Amino acid sequence: MFMKDILQSSECIEDQQNISMRPNLLDEFIGQSSVVSNLKIFIDAAYERKEPIDHILLYGPPGLGKTTLAHIIAKELKVNFRSTAGPLLSKAGDLAAILTNLQARDVLFIDEIHRLNRNIEEILYSAMEDFSLDIIVGEGCGARTLRVDIPPFTLIGATTRIGLLSNPLRDRFGIPMHLEFYSTEELTKVIKRAAKVIHTNISNNGAEEISLRSRGTPRIALRLLRRIRDFISVTKQDTITHEFADQALLRLGIDKLGLDRQDIKYLQFIYEANNPIGIDTISSALSEDTGNIEETIEPYLIKINFIQRTPRGRVITQKAISYLNEQTYNM
């Protein structure tokens, strides 16, 4: 595997259309106020001492800004940014090639770090703690370990499933940071800023309507904004108003709470079962990957108290049942 294959550009890791909307500095970053406030202190301290900032673990549901924050940290530190993803690092040589090509204080970003091969993960231990690599040279009885020094660097790991990280790896991150779902007010600001960047007029009520149906997630908000911009371009409307946003989102299959058809199928399946249901059964019924269910569907449904995870399986709440009974869905 060539270096260009394992060192992915940001365009490959994150939706290309979001890049122009991405903030470049912490002062431009909206939301995650506690995380941003602490990062400013850690970055300033590291920059003043001319040392790499301690290794950072960003975790939380998808689409909350983990990749964006990693980019910003490198820019604030005025160092190079290198990025890859856990599934791409299949061999020890892949990781060694990246680490030995880093410069002092560079930032290495590993997305989906929970998907690292355990053998690859073990190589990171000495790299993170001692800034060195233990490489086995030779085979059989003649094999020996060669220690190679690497420049001091910062590893930023991102994961949507922190529970899948081994304790030894998790404990080596000096700065663990949990990203939370966004409030409606924060998402409204994100949408208005993005609309300005892409030269699209939007009313305050229009931005708020999109934010209310974006599941507390900036990535979803920006995706919906782009799709509504398509509608407004074709219909020759001047501004995204509350009414226009509402109608466009309904055409996209997004209801008042931001639930789509797959969410409703998920809820109806559990409701009709009338018993706790295991994730594998749900996955089979919906023809949906279990990882996708656990990472993209369930977190928001848990947040709005529509489902509960129990030792026996998933259980629908009375709040969700009432909501389903109030709605009429064209499945």
Curated annotation (Swiss-Prot):
Annotated stretches, region: Large ATPase domain (RuvB-L): 4-182
Principal subcellular localisation of the protein: cytoplasm
Stretches the record annotates as Small ATPAse domain (RuvB-S): 183-253
Keywords carried by this UniProt record: ATP-binding, Cytoplasm, DNA damage, DNA recombination, DNA repair, DNA-binding, Hydrolase, Nucleotide-binding
Pfam families assigned: AAA_lid_4, RuvB_C, RuvB_N
Superkingdom to which the source organism belongs: Bacteria
Record-listed DNA binding positions: 309, 314
Gene Ontology molecular function terms on file: ATP binding; ATP hydrolysis activity; four-way junction DNA binding; four-way junction helicase activity
GO CC annotations on file: cytoplasm; Holliday junction resolvase complex
Keyword Chloroplast: no
EC number per UniProt: 3.6.4.-
Residues engaged in binding ATP: 22, 63, 66-68, 129-131, 172, 182, 219
Domain notes: Has 3 domains, the large (RuvB-L) and small ATPase (RuvB-S) domains and the C-terminal head (RuvB-H) domain. The head domain binds DNA, while the ATPase domains jointly bind ATP, ADP or are empty depending on the state of the subunit in the translocation cycle. During a single DNA translocation step the structure of each domain remains the same, but their relative positions change.
Described function: The RuvA-RuvB-RuvC complex processes Holliday junction (HJ) DNA during genetic recombination and DNA repair, while the RuvA-RuvB complex plays an important role in the rescue of blocked DNA replication forks via replication fork reversal (RFR). RuvA specifically binds to HJ cruciform DNA, conferring on it an open structure. The RuvB hexamer acts as an ATP-dependent pump, pulling dsDNA into and through the RuvAB complex. RuvB forms 2 homohexamers on either side of HJ DNA bound by 1 or 2 RuvA tetramers; 4 subunits per hexamer contact DNA at a time.
Record protein name field: Holliday junction branch migration complex subunit RuvB
Recorded name of the encoding gene: ruvB
